[in-house]
């Protein structure tokens, strides 16, 4: 399976969460012809190193793409991919960095799409869980959600959440953690993402409650 990222697709806008190293393949397979914005969860390579694939959309539209990052991710991207942000003789800047706020929203076809950002722990760094229209939460890399933030995750329609492996890991939720979490916040459906290659899709599916499913490449949520 490819490294995880997500696309929020509305009628006229495509908004990415993260730029995985497999982004080009993911965009082609999903027939995505434009990207309007990118929101990052954190700075690790498996969520950022497809950033150069955004160049195609800049060249197509001749318009910088807005990205939204926390401070650590901003620093990492500027240091590692400075040519995407600063003008030089060889490459035009393709991205405009923006500071991540607690709440963002944008309009498409008269409808407002809202994103709430919640800081979660991912081992010894912070990662971001995004809550979209108060219906879907996306937390691709998480080892702890703070108690004060659980109320923002109550009774969701969908919870898309990190499940690296069956047993304890210091930087990621495992299956035991998730089953305890969903008893507390009661999402209607939970989708497990960021699954390690050691987890077989059919094997884990047999172990899960009916309202919990493993994600797969090109998973769609309506």
Residue ranges and their predicted role:
Residues 61-65, 73-97:
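Active-site neighborhood of divalent metal-dependent phosphoester bond hydrolases
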Residues 146-221:
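Binuclear metal-ion centers of metallo-dependent hydrolases, dominated by the metallo-beta-lactamase
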Residues 14-69, 155-157:
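Active-site metal-binding motif and surrounding structural segment of the metallo-beta-lactamase
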Residues 33, 93, 111-113, 154, ...:
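Structured loop/turn residues at beta-strand edges in well-structured enzyme cores
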């Amino acid at each position: 399976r490819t490294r995880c990222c997500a696309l929020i697709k509305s009628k006229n806008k495509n908004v990415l969460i993260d730029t995985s190293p497999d982004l080009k393949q993911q965009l082609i397979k999903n027939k995505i012809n434009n990207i309007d914005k990118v929101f990052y969860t954190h700075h690790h390579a498996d969520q950022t190193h497809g950033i150069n694939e955004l160049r195609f959309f800049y060249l197509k539209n001749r318009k910088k793409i807005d990205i939204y990052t926390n401070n650590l991710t901003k620093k990492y991207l500027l240091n590692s991919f400075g040519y995407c942000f600063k003008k030089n003789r060889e490459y035009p800047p393709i991205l405009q960095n923006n500071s991540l706020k607690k709440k963002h929203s944008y309009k498409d076809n008269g409808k407002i799409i809202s994103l709430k950002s919640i800081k979660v722990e991912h081992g010894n760094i912070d990662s971001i869980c995004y809550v979209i229209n108060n219906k879907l939460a996306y937390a691709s890399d998480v080892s702890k959600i703070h108690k004060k933030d659980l109320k923002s995750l109550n009774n969701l329609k969908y919870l898309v959440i990190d499940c690296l492996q069956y047993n304890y890991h210091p930087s990621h939720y495992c299956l035991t953690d998730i089953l305890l979490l969903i008893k507390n916040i009661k999402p209607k459906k939970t989708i497990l993402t960021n699954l390690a290659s050691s987890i077989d899709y059919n094997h884990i599916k047999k172990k899960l409650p009916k309202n919990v499913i493993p994600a797969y490449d090109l998973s769609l949520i309506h």
